[in-house]
Amino acid sequence: GDVYKRQVLEQALLGVAASVGNLGVTEDKERVGKVFDQLFFMGYWVFGFAGICLFEMLNPFVELAFGSQYLFQREIVLVLCINFFINGMRRAVLIFKESMGLFWYDRYKAVAEAVLNLVISVLLVTYLGVAGVFVGTFCSTVLTSVWVEPYVIYKYRLERPVTGFFIKYAGYLGVMAAVWGITEYCCRFISGQVFFVLVLRLMICLIVPNILLWLVYRKTVEWRELWSLLKRIVKFP
């Protein structure tokens, strides 16, 4: 659930999140913006990677642990993992927004999201079954939280247009979709006993997405700062 996702992100981003609260007292908007970009990038990488692992390994794990009769439909797993990824990226935004005390400006967002979620889910469940509920959750999140929360940060704290953020967001989504597709392509060739399928998929998920993301972002400021933080966490020279 959301609590679990928040715990995962906050542990993964411990070094950055610890410093976010201190930014509330500074007027250096450029510094605040850089930390926000770093936090968002880390959330993107962590939850993109986790979403891919979940998508490729959930059903093999369920089959191994409980039997094939309990397998989820592939479409439902996909929607669940996309929701996991999108909400995971939101956690970085929410950590930042909460530390800045920007609660007032999007006070009606939760109500709008709940109403949209209910209406869309009811409409879609007729055509898609259980998957319609998860698609409804995705749609309501995209129509509200995904754009409202960054807008509040950019307008009331960073005081600059949010357009650049959404362009970067779209680029991130495009890259992650490609990485996800390549990883899925690699995993399709694996067959055999469920245990070995699970192990091999785990190896692919650990290696392929991270290498591809590194190849894309290795020259960016966000990656250099992420690598610097990781070295400090693991005491790597």
Model features per residue range: what roles?
Residues 1-110:
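Specific pore-lining/lateral-gate transmembrane helices of multi-pass inner-membrane transport
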Residues 2, 46, 50, 54, ...:
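Alpha-helical transmembrane segments of multipass membrane proteins
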Residues 10-11, 56, 75-101, 105-125, ...:
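Short runs within selected transmembrane alpha-helices of multi-pass transporters and secretion channels
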Residues 12, 52, 56-60, 119, ...:
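Transmembrane alpha-helix boundary/anchor motif
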Residues 16, 21-34, 152-170, 224-228:
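Interhelical loop/hinge segments that connect adjacent transmembrane helices in multipass membrane
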Residues 57-59, 66-70, 101, 124-129, ...:
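Short helix-capping/hinge motifs at transmembrane helix termini and TM-loop junctions
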Residues 72-76, 164, 168, 172, ...:
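Residue-level signature of transmembrane alpha-helical entry/exit and packing/kink sites
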Residues 160-161, 181-237:
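Membrane-proximal transmembrane or re-entrant/amphipathic helices at the cytosolic face
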